[in-house]
């Protein structure tokens, strides 16, 4: 983690469980902003690929983590991602903040 970054106002570190996957790909920051929670992450070198942009695998893991947070808070029970598809729109450069929001439209039984 880059200790020189300035965390945007209103965001707090998102607590992850030590030793679990999400603890290795952050840190994430969170802002509870009714009616929507917003996550951000600073893209530093450890999250980048050889092109100095966010690694696609990280972006997918980040999307899955944020989506899981929203899904769990909707159903209040353990959930899993059954399917996750992504079409990348544009790269996220090292040194940028990446914001994520999610919306649960439907839920299934699997």
PLM ranges: what are they?
Residues 1-110:
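Terminal targeting signals and extreme-terminal segments of soluble enzymes
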